[in-house]
Regions:
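Conserved catalytic-core motifs of GNAT/GCN5-like acyltransferases
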Residues: 43-45, 59-74, 237-252
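A short beta-loop-alpha structural element at the N-terminal edge
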Residues: 111-126
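Conserved active-site tyrosine of GNAT-family acetyltransferases
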Residues: 52-58, 230-232
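Conserved GNAT acetyl-CoA-binding A-motif
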Residues: 36-47, 208-220
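A short, internal acetyl-CoA/4′-phosphopantetheine-binding micro-motif in the GNAT/acyltransferase core
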Residues: 12-24, 185-193, 220-221
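A conserved beta-strand-loop-helix scaffold within acyl/acetyltransferase catalytic domains
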Residues: 2-13, 125-189
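N-terminal charged segments
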Residues: 1-37, 50-51, 83
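Conserved acetyl-CoA-binding loop-helix of GNAT-fold acetyltransferases
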Residues: 22-34, 187, 193-210, 229, ...
Length: 263
């Protein structure tokens, strides 16, 4: 498994995926800590490397089961900016989780609209949906050409359409470690309450199975009752909250990690 580094200036963070943690990785991380000021550093790694990262000032914030080809990823973080370290919505986050945990509803009715993978002809409508739903977002989902490039590389986009218009969408971002993240979830306001994301996630799970992906996870806005409820009802397990993780809607927001094995 290869290590990957993402210097994400847009979200004032470094995200590193380190299934191995060599001397060179340690030096690279130390140099970044000593020479750069970042709001947040995030490292996904295996459990045997957590001690070395804690020695560098990192602490465990969450985990995601099966991330590294079936092995659990421990998510450790380190902050240079105190305001980034402290949640602004801790009480609200806990209230959302409590509501979600108490829910026992099962979704059984069929979807009212067709669900399927996005085609090139859908990209303008997909971008228009994202512009309508999100004033801010951590990646460029507002440009049809950027969406096309994503779909040609590591992303599977699925959509619910009505009369040719994309009214709900989500994607699965392939990690390269036989796991994938459910992300970019949006529903046009007029169509909310129809459980459309439920069917989108099911569709993406099936597409991931076809590609040999064994584990799937979602990093979900901690304040969003709807999306947390969606993945919980689909059998995902809560595995922690990432504080002020990325810019979305209202600025930096806390994100919940949910995961499950694909059977």
């Amino acid at each position: 498994m290869n290590n990957k580094w993402d210097f994400d200036d847009e979200n004032d963070r470094l995200v590193a995926y380190l299934p191995s943690f060599t001397y060179n990785d340690s030096v690279k991380l130390k140099e970044d800590i000593n020479n750069a000021v970042r709001g947040k550093r995030i490292v996904y790694t295996l459990s045997e490397h957590t001690g070395a990262l804690k020695d560098l000032g990192f602490s465990v914030e969450a985990e995601t089961s099966g991330f590294f080809e079936g092995e659990k990823a421990i998510i450790l973080t380190q902050y240079d900016k105190e305001e980034r370290k402290n949640s602004k919505t801790k009480t609200e986050n806990e209230e959302v989780l409590n509501r979600v945990r108490e829910d026992s509803k099962q979704i059984s009715q069929p979807c009212l609209y067709p669900v399927g993978l996005v085609q090139d002809r859908d990209l303008k409508s997909l971008a228009a949906l994202y512009k309508k739903v999100f004033p801010k977002y951590p990646t460029n989902i507002f440009d049809p050409e950027a969406l096309k490039k994503a779909a040609e590389s590591d992303y599977l986009f699925a959509a619910v359409k009505n009369g040719g218009e994309v009214i709900a969408a989500a994607s699965a971002m392939k990690t390269g470690y036989r796991s994938a993240e459910i992300t970019d979830c949006a529903v046009k306001p007029d169509y909310r309450g129809n459980q459309l994301l439920h069917y989108l996630v099911l569709d993406l799970e099936e597409e991931c199975r076809k590609e040999g992906i064994n584990h799937i996870f979602s990093i979900t806005r901690a304040r969003s009752t709807g999306m947390n409820m969606t993945v919980k009802r689909l059998g995902y397990q809560y595995e922690g909250t990432l504080i002020n993780n990325c810019i979305i809607t209202s600025g930096f927001e806390d994100m919940n990690v949910w995961s499950q094995a694909l059977k």
